Amino acid sequence: MKQLYKKSNLFGLLFCLMFGSAFAQTRITGRVSDAVSGDAIIGASVLEKGTSNGIITDIDGNFALSVSDPNAILVVNYTGYGSLEVPLAGRSQVDITIAEAEGLLEEIVVVGYGVQRKSDLTGAVGTVKAKDIERIPTASVEQALQGKIAGVYVSPSSGEPGRGATIRIRGTGTLNNAGPLYVVDGMLLDDASFVNPQDVASIEVLKDASATAIYGNRGANGVIIITTKRGTKDRKAVVSLGSYYGTQQIAKKLSLVNGSEFAQMYNELPNNSSPLANPAQYGEGTDWQDVIFRDAPIANAQLSVNGVWKKLDYNVSGNFFNQQGIIEETGFERYTGRFNGEYPLLKNLKIGTNVAYSKELLQSVGGGVLGGVYRMPPIYSVFDSTGKYSDPTKFGQSIGNPAADLFYKNDQDTRVNRLVGTVHADWTFLKDFTFRTNYGFDRRNDHFRYHEPVFMVTTSQLNNLDRTTRDTTKTQNWLWENTLNYNKAWEDVRLNVLAGQSAQENYYKKRNTINGILQPNGEQITEWAMLSYLGRVNATFFDRYLFTASLRADGSSRFSKANRWGYFPSLAAGWNIAEEPFMRSQKVFNRLKLRASWGITGNDKIQEYPSLGTISNELYSAFGDTVQQGSTLVNYANADVRWETTRQTDVGLEFTVLKGRFTVEMDWYRRFTFDILSDLPIPDYVGSGAFPFVNAAQVENTGWDFTLQWRETKGKVSYNLGMILSPVKNKVLKLNEGKSEIFEGRTGSGDFSTRTAVGSPIGAFYGYQVEGVFQNQEEIDSAPNFGIEKPGDFRFADLNGDSILNSMDRTYLGSPIPTLTYGFSAGMELFGFDIAADFFGVKGNKVVNAKAVARFDTPNWESVWNENHWTGEGSSNSVPRVTNGGHNYKMSSFLVEDGAFFRLRTVVLGYTLPQRWLSNIGMSRARFYASGTNLWTKQSYSGFTPEFPGDNSFRAGIDYLSYPMAKTMLVGLDVTF
């Protein structure tokens, strides 16, 4: 690993010593605002005319830009407004107002290692700006992306506070971790949980290979670039305060039987030796959801100060976020602090830093609470007549009182302390060259603690040993990158050339103890390192013809020397058709661009050391009763293991019509991923359950991204409408030799519920097809069955027609991967009021209601069972009889439900006080608002929510009784001084 960095250190040193002279530049600061309302224009592009040197305005409309000439001309553009040229005439401070325009304006987009004009962009990049993030309160940056960008599927991992989200960009392209790369202020990371959404200036999602190949072996699953807010560039400090408070409720409760309905159904159980007398006496009984779920508060407070102090541009912020869970004794608390600053040491040399600290506390409860809610009979109250917790073991040893679990298993928490940041220096010389050195770091400490006291509720709900389990993890990650950028503009040509080097190292250590004693295999240490070289060329000719080429070489310590290096090229071209002379007379298109790209990227989210054999230490009783320490092989070595690789092709069309009001972007893409790492089965006679990793599998994703947007301003009224559509098809093209299928995702019956095979999607559901319910013995005798069926049991299809019912009759039952994701948004601002609403939905996916397997071995049922279950011949052909055995519990189409949904994700109503009311009290802005989240959902699924994708692609879409989603109502206030 040390040898890997000898080249890195030498390369960086050569960069630093390469040039010894520089030319001065002039630093310009200013603010861009609306010519009518005076409101700040957020995200406007400010360019030095004749160059690609530019920047975008921040949340307050402010900008700072170093120009080559004190008499340069600034070109200011923003969608929906007119383009404006501003001669500097020696000024270093300019306030600019722009008005609504007839034509289309320029936009600046953040890309890998730089920025580009939207009109020059050849890649597929989606953007969410600060204004869109701030108007809708969210707990994480992942939530802010849901339904916002075509091709980006965001689904919460759980409804539990503090849990992250699963993000898939243009489908699932691997059998391993398919999560994207995050780049936060230049630091390359696997997650962005530490980022406070209110600190974000913009989020860019890089989707095609032209945009992601510059990140090489980490770009295959897409890249999310997060840029946080900088100083306002004003001389005086700007202080912003924001706070909101609200309440949360469970978004949807299960419809379960009441006490009397339960007693009646229980009495129908076959071989029931102790029926319940007089079912009506139990009445409504106890809805255990009301016992465990609660209304829970949510609160947030934000303070930020930004400005300039003695040439230091700064943005300082602090945030407190607290979200209590809708299940008792659960919740999440986070403190964050951030400092972003930049200081010009010389006219051509500036240094800066972006540092964030976060402290998190996640409180959870032990297993059994949600299961008890689902399985506990409603005829019981929380306590029995003696004041003890009720004992439900009469109805099954596996049933526990959820209130008791909540009381005895609530001492569980995870604490996270994290420091993430970058330190950089930018040196401009020879007018057109900029050298940047950037050092990034990520220091993270996690401490999980779970204390379970001695208790006994029943003979099956107890704990005999007072114990405290602790998991402590320490992660240290550093990154050092050096880039040289050449920007040159001629009359009809703009050229940008980037060359760079990157080095990164990660150290991870985990330790597991119980009551202070280190457990077998309780300590784990992993390290990896990466050395990379990168380059890119962007060229624009006559504002019409666009070309991009990039190449990155990555060397990784994860692989053997023979396969350590991977090379990831990309090519792209674009044609701004609307800029052609033959288009100048037409009045339809303000913008019309065709683009195409091709490239290769890799996936580094794989198991550590796949090329090496690994062992695990275990305790064995191999010699009588004496326990001995031993070791077992986990996987065999394979020195030929190499990168997972994705080859992607993209064709896109963008156009804007109706004087810049209506914009359409559409892309067709094909992602072909090959050399996917998978385990290779070995013969049983080898005598080990271990396996080697091999590059064998292939997966294809094809689809479309559509984005439609309408923006219009008339006087003091502005409104916008937006829609995204993202159809995608996922298919496995190849698996390992000798391994034609992969089974995963066991249900409570022990059956596997998913099968990954050639020709089907990853993690497709697989099982028996239910044809109906046997109505009488004659039907059973005349049909293939398992041999113990009774009237009222499922009739499974004999799909291969051999008159024998067995595992060969299982079939494809649907996919957890949506074939279509879509979103709608609408917003309006008028006379100080603003209203916005976002909708999000998916179609074409299925979910497995795995928790329903419990209905075949322990009592308690949903209301639909009471209403529709089989009670005699002709009574039902869809829901079986009440039973506690047989084969009805097998993985079948009965457990598979429609996973489609359409949700009102957020709605916000706000009012901004007029400026004239605030000037006398020192305020520059004050806005009150009310917001609702997850207020309405249209779904067919009978469970809490159809969203439970999980990080494991083989087990996505299986409901093992996940934490329910909450709906939220809150009020808030934002003020600026």
What is each PLM-predicted segment?
Residues 43, 95, 107, 127, ...:
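Extracellular/lumenal ectodomain signal focusing on beta-strand-rich modules
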